[in-house]
Amino acid sequence: MALAAAAAAAAAGVSQAAVLGFLQEHGGKVRNSELLSRFKPLLDAGDPRGRAARRDRFKQFVNNVAVVKELDGVKFVVLRKKPRPPEPEPAPFGPPGAAAQPSKPTSTVLPRSASAPGAPPLVRVPRPVEPPGDLGLPTEPQDTPGGPASEPAQPPGERSADPPLPALELAQATERPSADAAPPPRAPSEAASPCSDPPDAEPGPGAAKGPPQQKPCMLPVRCVPAPATLRLRAEEPGLRRQLSEEPSPRSSPLLLRRLSVEESGLGLGLGPGRSPHLRRLSRAGPRLLSPDAEELPAAPPPSAVPLEPSEHEWLVRTAGGRWTHQLHGLLLRDRGLAAKRDFMSGFTALHWAAKSGDGEMALQLVEVARRSGAPVDVNARSHGGYTPLHLAALHGHEDAAVLLVVRLGAQVHVRDHSGRRAYQYLRPGSSYALRRLLGDPGLRGTTEPDATGGGSGSLAARRPVQVAATILSSTTSAFLGVLADDLMLQDLARGLKKSSSFSKFLSASPMAPRKKTKIRGGLPAFSEISRRPTPGPLAGLVPSLPPTT
C-alpha cells in the first residue's frame, strides 16, 4: 500500500499539465538538465518496477508540449506553439479502485482502460516489442491483486502520432489470421507462444494471469514502432544507469554538461545525433564517471551557429590580403573580428596580411584592435601551426617579416606543427640581416658582409664549400702565375748567347753549393755506359758519347 501511495503521488506530480506549467514558468525554454532534475525525484518514487513506465509516460508528456532545439551544442526543451491534447491518465498511476470503473465503448483504445472484457490483453499488447532484459523488469507483476490494471508497462506504440482505433475496429483486427500477426523477431522468448487459443482469447476482468500467450496476436492492432523508437529502447539502459543505478559525482561542471546533453539525446530521444564534441566526451565516459579520475580540460566545442553577415564579409575581404576602407569600417564596428579565424585554414586577418606581404594591413590591424581594447595575438597559429611570421618567411616577404619582428614583437622561436621555425622557410637568396634577425644558428660567429660584397666578411658569410672553392681557385691562379713567370725567364735565357760569365751566373746556386752525385761501387756510372759502343742491331740507333779527354 505504501508503494501504491507513493506511485499515486508521483503520478499526480508528473503530468502533462505539470510539464507545461514548468516550461511556462521558465519562459517557454529550459535546459534538459533542469527539466530532468525537476522531475527525476518523482520518477524514481514508488515501485521500482514501474519506473520504466513512469519514465515513458514522462517522455510522452514532454513530446506533447515541447520540442528540442540545439544552441551552441546545448539542447533546450522549447514549448510548442500548439501543444498536443493530453491522453487519459493510466490506471496504475491512479487509485486502486479506478480500474473497476466502466468506460465508454466508443472511447479511445488505450492499454490502460481495463473496463471492457477484452481490455486485459490490450494492456499487455506492446510488451513483446521491448527487447528482453532491456530494463530488467518482469513481464507481469506477481504481487499486485489488480492483475492487468496494475501492470506498470508502457507500450512504445503510444508515442506514435497515428490516430487511435475505435473499439469496433480493434475487435475486427483481433479476428484476423495469424499471418498478419507474426511477432517481431526481437522477442525470442515469445516465439514459441501459440497465437490461436480461442478459449483464452477473451478472459474476464478477474483473469489476471491467464492470457500472456496472446500478446503476439495483438501486435498488429498497434503500429510497429519507428526505427528511432527502437534505437531509443536500445540506448535506454545507459540513461537508466546514469539516473538511478550508478550514482556519480554531480559537482563537476564538465560532468553536468555531459550528463545533461546525453540525457537529452538518450533518455528523451527528442533531437538529432550528438555533435563531435559530445562524442569525444562519451568516449571518456568511465574516466568522467569515476570520482577518482582527474578532470581534463575540454576543448571548446565548435560553433554550430552560422556566420553573421559582417563576419562573412570580413573573412572574404581579409582573404584578399589588402587593407581597404571596408575592412577598417568593419573592424571599428566589431573589434572581435581581428581574432576571427577562417574555418578552413585557421588563418586570422594577420595571417592573410603576412601571406600577401602587406605591411600596412598588418600595422592597421594591430593598431586599430589595440585602440579598441582587443589586442591581436601576433603569434596566433593556424590549423597547421603556422604563425604570420612563418607565412611571411615562406612566401619571401622580407619586409613583412622584419615588420612582424621589430614593430609588432613576433616571436622567432615559435615552431609550427612540423617542428620548424620561421628561418627554416627562408628562400636561398634571403639577406644576411633577415637570417640573423630570425635567429638562424648557421650564422653564429660570422660578421656582416661589406656593402660591396667583398672584404673579410664576404668570405666568412659564405658556406664552407664555397669558402674552400674560393681558396682553391685563388691558390691555383697564384701558382700558375709564378709558373708562367718562370717559363718566360727560361725563354729569355735561351735567346741570349751564353757567355762564360752568364753561364756561371746561371749555374751558380745562391743558397748552397751543389752536392756531388754519389756513385755506387757495384754499378757502373751512366757516363761509362754511354761511352761504351752499343753492340748488336742497335749500334746504329743509339749514338755513343765521344771519349773524354
UniProtKB/Swiss-Prot annotation:
Q: By which gene is this protein encoded?
A: SOWAHA
PANTHER family cross-referenced by the UniProt entry: ANKYRIN REPEAT DOMAIN-CONTAINING PROTEIN SOWAHA, SOSONDOWAH, ISOFORM G
The record's PROSITE patterns line, in alphabetical order, gives: ANK_REP_REGION, ANK_REPEAT
> Lineage of the source organism?
Eukaryota, Metazoa, Chordata, Craniata, Vertebrata
Q: Carries keyword Repeat?
A: yes
Q: Where is this region: Disordered?
A: 82-219, 235-256, 513-549
Q: Which organism encodes this protein? A: Homo sapiens (Human)
ANK repeat residues: 345-374, 384-414
According to its UniProt record, which protein family does this protein belong to? Belongs to the SOWAH family.
Q: Which cysteines are joined by disulfide bonds?
A: none
Identification of the protein by name: Ankyrin repeat domain-containing protein SOWAHA
